[in-house]
C-alpha cells in the first residue's frame, strides 16, 4: 500500500472569512448573575460579532458588573460596525445587572436601536429550582 501524499493538505491555505455587509440586524444581550454576553446577528440569526465580559478582560465577580456589560457591548458593536451594521433590534434575556447598561452603550457607539424586547424565559411551573443558598 503506497503512503498517503501530504501535498494536498499542506498546500491548502486557511481561508479568511469574507466580511458580510449587513446594515440591519439583531443584538442579543444575555445578562446572567455572573456574566453578560452580547451577540450581534444578521436577521436570519447568523452571528456577525460577539463579546462577553470575560472576553473583554474581566475576571471573577467583576464580570457581573454593569461596567463590564458596557465594555462587552461596545466591543461587539465596534466589530459589527466593521461589517457595515447601522441599525439593530435588541433582545434582552436574563436577570443580570448589565441589561440597561449594555443597551445604552450600544446606542452610544453609534448603532441605531430600533425595538427593545425582553425574551427572558419564564417557566409555567416547570422544573424545580435549585435549593436556596445558605451562606
UniProtKB/Swiss-Prot annotation:
Listed PROSITE patterns: RIBOSOMAL_S11
Keywords of this entry: Ribonucleoprotein, Ribosomal protein, RNA-binding, rRNA-binding
Biased composition (Polar residues): 1-10
Entry superkingdom: Bacteria
A GO molecular-function annotation: structural constituent of ribosome
Membrane found in the keyword field: no
Residue ranges of the region described as Disordered: 1-27, 114-135
GO cellular component terms, A-Z: ribonucleoprotein complex; ribosome
Compositionally biased intervals (Basic residues): 12-27
Similarity-based family: Belongs to the universal ribosomal protein uS11 family.
Name of the protein this chain belongs to: Small ribosomal subunit protein uS11
Organism of this sequence: Kineococcus radiotolerans (strain ATCC BAA-149 / DSM 14245 / SRS30216)
Taxonomic path: Bacteria, Bacillati, Actinomycetota, Actinomycetes, Kineosporiales
Gene name of the record: rpsK
Amino acid at each position: 500500500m503506497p503512503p498517503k501524499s501530504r501535498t494536498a493538505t499542506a498546500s491548502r491555505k486557511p481561508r479568511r472569512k469574507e466580511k458580510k455587509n449587513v446594515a440591519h440586524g439583531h443584538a442579543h444581550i444575555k445578562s446572567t448573575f455572573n456574566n453578560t454576553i452580547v451577540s450581534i446577528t444578521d436577521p436570519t440569526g447568523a452571528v456577525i460579532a460577539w463579546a462577553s465580559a470575560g472576553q473583554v478582560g474581566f475576571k471573577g465577580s467583576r464580570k457581573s458588573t454593569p461596567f463590564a456589560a458596557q465594555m462587552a457591548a461596545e466591543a461587539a458593536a465596534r466589530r459589527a460596525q466593521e461589517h457595515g451594521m447601522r441599525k439593530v433590534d435588541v433582545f434582552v434575556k436574563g436577570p443580570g445587572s448589565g441589561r440597561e447598561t449594555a443597551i445604552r452603550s450600544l446606542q452610544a457607539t453609534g448603532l441605531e436601536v430600533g425595538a427593545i424586547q425582553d425574551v427572558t424565559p419564564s417557566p409555567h411551573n416547570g422544573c424545580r429550582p435549585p435549593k436556596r443558598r445558605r451562606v
